[in-house]
Amino acid sequence: MKRKIVSVILALTMVFSMVGCGNSSETKTSSGTDTETSSETETTNDETSGTDESASSGEEVTLRLFSNLPDRKNGQGLVEQTIIDEYMAENPNVTIEVEALDEEAYKTKFKAYSMEGMPDVVSIWGQPAFLDEVVDAGVLAELNQDDYSEYGFVEGSLNGFTYDGKLYGLPRNTDIAVFYYNQKMFTDNGWEVPQTYNDLLALAGTIKDAGIIPVAMDGGDGWPMAVYLSDLLYKYAGSDYSQIISNAVSTGDFSAPELQKVTELLKETADAGLFQNGYDSQDYGTAMNLFTNGQAAMFYMGSWETSMATNEDIPEEIRTNIRVFTMPVVEGGKAQATDIAAWNGGGYAVSASSEVKEEAVKFLNYMYQPDKLSKYGWENGVGLSAQDQSAYMTGEETDLQKQVVDILSASTSLSGTPINDCGSSAFKTSIESEIQNVSNGTTSVDDFLSTIGASCN
């Protein structure tokens, strides 16, 4: 009983430890109407039923879906909404009520739901900082892994959603950390894509001299900076990356020279002016807007934002010229250019307390049918699925999509989970709240490493 109580408390505190992929603070309704002052959206269908026994007998079934994708008109939110609409059309006794909040609001509400009872289907992340404590607290329902043998999941993609040999969720994406850049801006100014990290820092000065922001960075949320640090560490430490992080998190000792080196390099990067003024307090949407309106030459984020190439809210001259490159090689580092920071991040799970659990699992399984999330995601250019998408490639994809696929295909190794998601929720909270201070010089490198180490004890 004592362990159970402690686990529940941990689950409540882990709300601040979730990795984010959503960028919009604005919610769209299913009809596409803007609702800027609202933080949630509800989708219903007047014709309701389900696919379980009660539904097939005509009994109405209502599913509640809690999502971190508030933009229902573009990207992953559009894909999610499309599948919901199709499910309700095919199962006219089922109503799916969607609550879709932006990242920070989602974290806060998840904490409340941990106390009050979770909605039936929820967005989750397959990383220890999130999954371990939630599963220990009994929040998520176990899934039957054998059910997904024919779903085309990429080898190893279910590992992060597995705990003590049991499956508790399904991954949506294969995520790659990339620099998006404005190809036309680069060409017009004679700038070259950097091949080394020193090249990148030198380019920052050149771009700044032109009156343009080199890289738009979401430094306010913490996790993108932690991913950036992980990206640097992988390029520097190479195959030792996972062991270095594991040793540090398990002992609380972050004095490894590799960690010291890349943290110093992060500070040097900020000092060189690679990021915009005020990056350490600006959020996802602000950083993305700097790039999509042409104020910044680059934007550091995950491959889930490849839908920018088809987003008509972005000026055509910009969206048709968005390209990507991965972290350049670091001087003295062990990794080569094709060793990239990539992992399986966000996905979905079913609440252990759901009163319509059978229907919730059936809806989850419907979402992951190979011709649903994977196919629609590819068609809408929302990055790479955790499932095989080769059957859906037509040759008509955007140049940005093709480039991301080529990067993954040419990769020689993948980093795995970013450092901020490799420990407890306390560690995640610590590193994501302290990383701004070390990058801007408020905190020394030694103090930063000591502070995050203390959070592991």
Regions found by a protein language model. Name each.
Residues 66-70, 83, 88, 264-355:
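Extracytoplasmic/periplasmic substrate-binding proteins
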Residues 206, 247-279:
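Glycine-centered hinge/linker elements that transmit conformational signals in sensory
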Residues 168-171, 177, 201-251:
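Extracytoplasmic/periplasmic solute-binding protein
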Residues 126-178, 192, 201, 207, ...:
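Hinge/lid segment of periplasmic solute-binding proteins
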Residues 162, 342, 379-393, 400-456:
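C-terminal capping/gating helix-and-loop segments adjacent to ligand/active sites or protein-protein/ligand interfaces
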Residues 113, 119-120, 150-184, 213-217, ...:
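A structural signal for short loop-to-beta-strand junctions that line the ligand-binding cleft
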